[in-house]
């Protein structure tokens, strides 16, 4: 069962998503991956941030109310 993140709510904030990524990587004992992931998340627009997040955590989370133009590859 995956968690649903409403991207139009406070959990859809880019800073919240980066903090969530940090938290989950810590819980998975993979904190060393965060700096590279954060750099990749910040290297483009909001849709890029969402794609990077989904690539890493797609088995844990689903997005609700994704912005127009966002497509999860």
Question: Where would I find each of the regions flagged by the language model?
Answer:
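Long, contiguous binding/interaction regions
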Residues: 1-73
């Amino acid at each position: 069962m995956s968690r649903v993140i409403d991207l139009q709510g406070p959990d859809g904030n880019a800073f919240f998503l980066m903090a969530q990524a940090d938290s989950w990587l810590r819980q998975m004992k993979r904190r060393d991956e965060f700096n590279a992931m954060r750099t990749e998340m910040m290297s483009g627009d909001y849709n890029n941030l969402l794609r990077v997040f989904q690539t890493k955590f797609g088995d844990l989370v689903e997005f609700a109310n994704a912005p127009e133009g966002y497509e999860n590859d």
